[in-house]
């Protein structure tokens, strides 16, 4: 089955940095941007230039440094925002201005204090201004999933008429569900895009733990750009995780016939670099890049993995840049894993010695959360003394 290309829009440096405790200085942003370029993302959203001098400088530095990737700068639908974004992107080889305004009634009434008509005019003016500066303009309808669908489509249509070539449909507060989001993307595709050369993008937050599921549903419904972050960092509960989306498409190509330009073997190194920069480790059981993603403790699982890793792994550790899987020795481990670990440590033990060592091992594992190699060596010494 032929595969359809989906663009990866990485917003680690912009939305990701808004995650509490995840701020980066200019040097760190450039370092991370270079890694993202090596990873093969299509677009790097480098920051929000009007927000601060630091953000402006970071966008300018990333734009100058990363010449083999599109670089985007965020701007509200305000004249000074768009002008500042354009200035920051001055040295980009492939610049994109990403302008946005909210379209939900709750945002219009309580945040913007604007009427629907005023927001339409703001959209038209900002996109036109952005097109004067950049060949490529992306428009986002903030809080799209809580917006009136008829009004949302009206605003998006105005953005296309004004020159936007990418329409982003954000689930700003992580409110939607996969079935609901599928219908919304289909509506935008049918009523706004039609036969025009316009890309539908999605940007999902993880407040209900559905960011990746919603992103994949949107791709199936016709979205051809997905916005995401390394390790899923971002506002509140975070964004859709880049590595999870990419590997879902990679592993389930039978069900999801889509491809990206991501070098999957660079996923784990990119995750580790980000963690080192922000000092914010991913949870151990995080899919794809967590410490336990390829770790096995249960004895039945360990036996299967020893015989053939595919018994309990749907991808190889090496495919995402992890050197090997890990058999974690703990209270649920079996004899096969213990015997293998002794062999790796250079010990050739008999079945009888293994029986004695295993009994001592299970007793120790009931008392200790982690078993170290020195513990295993000590157990063997105790076994030898008992035999003597």
Role assignments for model-derived ranges:
Residues 1-5, 11, 17, 71-74, ...:
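Domain-level signal for soluble alpha/beta catalytic cores
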Residues 5-6, 12, 247, 255-388:
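A mid-to-C-terminal "edge-of-domain" accessory segment
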Residues 6-8, 18-43, 56-65, 79-200, ...:
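Alpha/beta enzyme core
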Residues 13, 48-49, 74-77, 101-104, ...:
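Short, ordered loop/turn segments at secondary-structure junctions
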Residues 15, 20, 209:
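An N-terminally biased module of ancient metal coordination in phosphate/nucleic-acid-related enzymes
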Residues 24-27, 31, 53-57, 80, ...:
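Conserved active-site and cofactor/substrate-binding residues in soluble primary-metabolism enzymes
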Residues 43-47, 70-73, 139-141, 201-203, ...:
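Short catalytic-loop micro-motif centered on adjacent basic/acidic residues
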Residues 176, 183-308, 312:
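Catalytic alpha/beta core domains of metabolic enzymes, predominantly
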